[in-house]
Amino acid sequence: MLNRMKSARPKSVAPKSGQALLTLGALGVVFGDIGTSPLYSLHTAFSMQHNKVEVTPENVYGIISMVLWTITLIVTVKYVMLVTRADNQGQGGILALVALLKNRGHWGKFVAVAGMLGAALFYGDVVITPAISVLSATEGLTVISPSFERFILPISLAVLIAIFAIQPLGTEKVGKAFGPIMLLWFVTLAGLGIPQIIVHPEILQSLSPHWALGLIVAEPFQAFVLLGAVVLTVTGAEALYADMGHFGARPIRVAWFCVVMPALILTYLGQGALVINQPEAVRNPMFYLAPEGLRIPLVILATIATVIASQAVISGAYSLTKQAVNLKLLPRMVIRHTSRKEEGQIYMPLVNGLLFVSVMVVVLVFRSSESLASAYGLAVTGTLVLVSVLYLIYVHTTWWKTALFIVFIGIPEVLLFASNTTKIHDGGWLPLLTAAVLIVVMRTWEWGSDRVNQERAELELPMDKFLEKLDQPHNIGLRKVAEVAVFPHGTSDTVPLSLVRCVKDLKLLYREIVIVRIVQEHVPHVPPAERAEMEVLHHAPIRVVRVDLHLGYFDEQNLPENLHAIDPTWDNATYFLSALTLRSRLPGKIAGWRDRLYLSMERNQASRTESFKLQPSKTITVGTELHL
C-alpha cells in the first residue's frame, strides 16, 4: 500500500500559454491580500502610538527600508524560494506541511498542535482581512472630500454583505476576471509610484538596509513598535504557499518576480517620496499618489481589488475547513461544489454564515482600518513563526543552513510577533480570541471522538465471531434478502453496529455484505485507480467483502462513485448507517462543559447521508444509544 501511495507527480510541464494563464490566475487569487496592503500599511506606521512617529526623511527612509527588506526576506526568500518546495503532492499550506510531518517520531504531537494552532490563527486572519481591506478602500473617499466620511461604514457594510451573499453562486464566471483586474491593480500601483520616484530619486536610498538598521539603533523602542505596522506589508504571504495546489509553484514564482514584487516596491518607494515632500499625505498616502481627477476611479478599482482579496481568503477558509474535517479535526459539514470543472471551488454554508456574522461584528466594533490594523498583526506573525518551525523540522538540513535561516528569517519573524504582542489591548485580542475558540472546538472534537470510538468498540462484535455465526444453523431463522447491502465503518476488525442491529433486531441478512472503511491518507489526492483495497472475508451463501477506501484530504468521500469503480453491480445497493444517540452519564447540570460542547457538535454536524453522497431512498439509518 505504501509503495502505491508514493507515486510520483507527473513531470510534464504545461505549455507556455497554459503557464501564462496560470500566472494570470495566480495574480487574481494568490496575491489579492498582499496586493492591497499598500492601502493602509504606511499610514498605519506613522499613526502608531498616536502619531508619535515624526515625518522626517530619516524616519521615512528607515520605515520604507524595513518594509522592503521584510518583503524580501519573508516573502521572496522564505516563501517563494524555500517553503514552496515543501509541497505535499503539489499542495501547500500549513495543514499540508503538518500532513507531511505526521509520522516524524517524537515530533508528531508537537506538529499536530502547531498545525492546529496555525489553522486557528488563519481563521483569525480570515475574519480581519475582508473588514480591513474593504474599509481601507472606501476610506479613500475622504481624500476626495472629508464630507464622504459618514458614508464609509454603510458602503463598507454593503460591499461585505454582497461578498458573502454571492458565495453560494461560486466564482467560476466572475473568477475569470480576477486575474486581469489584479494585473491592472498592480500596474496601477507601479504607475502611481514611478512619478514620485522620478521627482524625488533620493527615496531610492531606502533600498539599502543600513537605513533600517540605523533606525533600529537610533530609536530601538520606536523601531520595535513600528514592526507591528511593517508586518502589514506581508499579510497574505501564507497564500503563496496555501494556494500552490491551485496554480503550481512556478506560476506563483513568475507572478511574484515579474509583476507583484516590482509593483509593491515601486508603490512603497513612491509613497515614501510623496510623504517626504508632502507630510500631510501621510493621512492616506496611497490615494494622495493619484491626481485629483483619478481618485474616484482609484477608489472604485481599490474596492474591487479588496473584494477579490476578500474572496481569496474566504475560499481559503473553505479549503482549510475541508482539510480539517477530513483530518478529523472538525465535525462533518455540508460542502457544495460551485463548479463542474474545478474540484477546489466549493461553498460551505456554515463557514460562510459564521464568517459573515464575525466580519460584520468586527466592522461595527472597530469602524476603521486604522483601528483594525492593531488586530491584524498577531494572526499573521503567529502563522509566519509556526510555518518556519515546521519547515525547519521538514527540511532537517545542515546546522549552518539552519543557522542562516534562523538569523535572517526566524529572528526577524519572532521580533515581528513580539512587536504585535504590544497591541493586544488595542485589538490584538481579536485573533487570539478567535484562535482560542477554534482550538477549544478542535481539541474537544478530537477528545470526544476518541471517547466515542472507545465506547463504540465495546459494543461492536469482533469480525471473526460474526463470520463464524454466518455458518451456524440458527441463521436459518433469518430473513435473507437477495440484494447488496453496504455498511460504512471506521475500523477493520469489528462489525458495524448497524449490521449487528440489522441481524439481531431486524432479522435481516443480505446476500452480499460490503463493509467500507475510509482510510484518510496524509496526501491531498489519491488517484482513483489506487484507492481501493478489497478482501473477501466470507463466500457462499452470504458473501462478505471488506473494502478499504484510501482518500486524500481533498478527495470527496463519495461512496457510490468510488464503489462503482470497484464493482458496478453494487450500484443498486442499500446503504446502512449507524446513527449514535449520545448521552452523558452525568445529569445536564453536572456534565462538564466539554461534554456539552461535544454533544452539541455531534448532534448538529452534517448527516453522513449527505457527506457520503448517498441517495436517501437507498439509505437506512439504524440508531444506537451510547452513554459517555
From Swiss-Prot:
Swiss-Prot/TrEMBL catalytic activity: K(+)(in) + H(+)(in) = K(+)(out) + H(+)(out)
CC per GO annotation: plasma membrane
Keywords: Cell membrane, Ion transport, Membrane, Potassium, Potassium transport, Symport, Transmembrane, Transmembrane helix, Transport
Predominant subcellular localization, coarse grouping: membrane
Molecular function per GO: potassium ion transmembrane transporter activity; symporter activity
Annotated transmembrane regions: 20-40, 63-83, 110-130, 151-171, 178-198, 212-232, 256-276, 296-316, 346-366, 375-395, 398-418, 422-442
Compartment(s) of residence: Cell membrane
Record PANTHER family: LOW AFFINITY POTASSIUM TRANSPORT SYSTEM PROTEIN KUP, OSMOTIC STRESS POTASSIUM TRANSPORTER
Function noted in UniProt: Transport of potassium into the cell. Likely operates as a K(+):H(+) symporter.
Protein family according to the UniProt entry: Belongs to the HAK/KUP transporter (TC 2.A.72) family.
Protein known as: Probable potassium transport system protein Kup
Gene: kup
